[in-house]
């Protein structure tokens, strides 16, 4: 499961590229300082875009914690997308999670080696992307989780699940709770991702 992402894209580029959706983008808490981060892990804050919660037309970009405590105390940082619709309730809904890379780990070939191999996945044709997420109000404040689906051919050699990465054409559709999640939560086609070994 995905528990580490990269976000080095500048806020200005996010704002400019999001204009493609023709959805006004607001910053109700002020423009966040999106310092480039090579590693964002569970419980770290990251930028999300969600339908406006202040009554303004459009969407808003805020930073929120990744994961919330589950009933067993373990962090809910990924959630399976299959069989669910993920509409909006008064305490949460769909969001886009901003990143330009994510990491997966594989076991070393040598069974005596303790350190796993680390792989960085990036989009071949885009500088950054949005992952399908859910946000909600929790005991630790507002937080988000990432949705997962079956792996596409680029990820299958490394993991048996993949995060849901949305095409730019689907950003606005994901923020619309009337669009069925199953229409959007699909594996990526072959050749969408580049992969590089980090260690």
Write out the residue ranges for each language-model feature.
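Short linear sequence motif anchored by a di-proline
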Residues: 1-199
């Amino acid at each position: 499961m995905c528990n580490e992402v990269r976000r080095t894209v500048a806020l200005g580029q996010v704002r400019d590229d999001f204009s493609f959706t023709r959805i006004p983008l607001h910053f109700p808490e002020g423009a966040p300082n999106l310092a480039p981060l090579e590693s964002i892990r569970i419980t770290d804050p990251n930028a999300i875009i969600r339908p406006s919660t202040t009554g303004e037309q459009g969407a808003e970009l805020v930073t929120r914690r990744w994961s919330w405590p589950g009933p067993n105390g373990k962090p809910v940082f990924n959630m399976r997308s299959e069989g669910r619709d993920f509409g909006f309730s008064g305490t949460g809904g769909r969001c886009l999670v901003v990143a330009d890379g994510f990491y997966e780990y594989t076991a070393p070939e040598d069974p005596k080696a303790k350190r796993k191999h680390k792989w960085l996945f990036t989009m071949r044709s885009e500088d950054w992307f949005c992952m399908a997420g859910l946000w909600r109000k929790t005991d630790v404040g507002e937080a988000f989780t990432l949705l997962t689906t079956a792996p596409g051919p680029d990820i299958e050699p490394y993991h048996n699940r993949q995060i849901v990465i949305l095409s730019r054409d689907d950003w606005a559709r994901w923020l619309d709770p009337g669009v069925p999640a199953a229409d959007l939560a699909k594996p990526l086609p072959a050749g969408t991702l580049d992969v590089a070994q980090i260690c």
